[in-house]
Amino acid sequence: MTLAIALFTYYVFSILQLTRKDLLTGLLNRQAFYADIRNNPEDITALVSLDMNGLKAINDSEGHAAGDEALSTLALCFMRALRRGQSGYRIGGDEFAIICRRCSREETDQLVERIRNYVAETPYSCSVGYSCAGEEPRETDDLLRESDAMMYAEKARYYESSGRDRRKD
């Protein structure tokens, strides 16, 4: 009986873990992101927003399998960059996020630098924005809004410098 309960518990836990994973990238998914933001929000010291540049162009010119490969490659870059207290998520499409718990500003800066370095080793690029709580606890909605704004500003600079029309990308 004890073995049956242990096996049942293991299978239930395994199924629950699958519901939190993005099957393409292996990162946690959007559902897990919002659940984790609600779980001990006072421990969240920074949020990082990431968005792949040019995914639509890859999908249109090389096919969706190539786009999936690009997303998986970027996800591996993000996973390599993560350290203790940092969790990576695929929010959907070409959008990603990282929650940093009990990480200093310096650790968050180092995370973003590692991401930029790892992505630079690939043929792809992404726009990154982040927001740190600082000394005083802040609402996660504010952190998310600020990191998204920073990421979208970087994305706009990417499109301006590349001369590409972001509406087609």
Feature locations, PLM:
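Active-site-proximal alpha-helical element of nucleotidyl cyclase-like catalytic domains
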Residues: 66-85
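Catalytic-core segments of nucleotide cyclases and related cyclic-nucleotide turnover enzymes
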Residues: 105, 109-116, 127, 132-169
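Residue-level recognition of strand-loop junctions within catalytic nucleotide-signaling folds
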Residues: 60, 100-103, 133-134
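Short catalytic/binding micro-motifs of nucleotide second-messenger systems
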Residues: 80-85, 111-125
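Hydrophobic framework residues that shape the active-site pocket
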Residues: 55, 74, 96, 128
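Conserved nucleotide-binding and Mg2+-coordinating catalytic segments in signaling enzymes
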Residues: 15-35, 50-64, 69-72
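Signal-transducing coiled-coil linker helices
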Residues: 1-24, 31-45
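A short pre-motif secondary-structure segment
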Residues: 87-90
